[in-house]
Curated annotation (Swiss-Prot):
One of its GO terms (molecular function) is phosphoribosylanthranilate isomerase activity. One of its GO terms (biological process) is L-tryptophan biosynthetic process. PROSITE patterns: IGPS (PS00614). Keywords: Amino-acid biosynthesis, Aromatic amino acid biosynthesis, Decarboxylase, Lyase, Tryptophan biosynthesis. InterPro entries: Aldolase_TIM (IPR013785), Indole-3-glycerol_P_synth (IPR045186), Indole-3-glycerol_P_synth_dom (IPR013798), Indole-3-GlycerolPSynthase_CS (IPR001468), RibuloseP-bd_barrel (IPR011060). It catalyses: 1-(2-carboxyphenylamino)-1-deoxy-D-ribulose 5-phosphate + H(+) = (1S,2R)-1-C-(indol-3-yl)glycerol 3-phosphate + CO2 + H2O. It comes from the Bacteria. This is Indole-3-glycerol phosphate synthase. The gene is trpC. The keyword Lyase applies. The keyword Lyase applies.
Amino acid sequence: MTILDEIVDYKRNLIKEGYYEEKLKTLNEVDITHKSSFKSQLDESNQLAVIAEIKSKSPTLDQLPNRDLAQQVKDYEANGANAVSILTDEHYFGGSYERLQDLTLQTTLPVLCKDFVVDKIQIDVAKKAGASIILLIVNVLTDQQMKDLYQYATSLNLEVLVEVHDKEELERAYKLKPQIIGVNNRDLKRFVTDVLHTNEILENKKEGYYYISESGIRDEQDVANVVESGIDGLLIGESLMKCEDLSQFLPGLKLTKVTK
């Protein structure tokens, strides 16, 4: 069993145990109607968009620096981030829906609920907590599940980042005709990362979609290496959480898009 299989099994058990029903009862409704969409920001700029992530740990990291997360989110916005990603998995990533709820109130930026979605109730909880965007990982869903969850999320006026890791998954994603596709440079089965993976996967990408390179971006050189693939944005977590001066680091990542 891979780490990804283990995480997905854990999510299914949480569903059976009523974890998400309880969250729907205890979370307060958050109004985010004033927030702009992430897609509108992708539409309006010739620079790479940055989804800046809040994370505490992962299966490959014991612990990240202990930050004032409310301030971190404000610093992300002040230094040019276009959206914020917040991990809500408690067991493997040290996040929570309560954290998402607290932090979405600290920013005018749209917030991505970063989790392993396998059921509509998880989308309900993300929406109630104040997410503007949800993540669907192609690898853990059948085509029918993906279609059902995508349509359900968009019916709730949520944006969807559809995540792929290989060319086969990219072709499956295209069937949905999603607006935004993320290419994860991290193999979620083995949790190994290669930042140039984006270039390989998008060699023959189709037009009419926005593409986000996710994971493994450490510096401006990494961005320069992947921007040639024709991406529209980046999702960055660990490097930003470790950074001691976001005002120097984050704006430098927003290179001009390369049209292919």
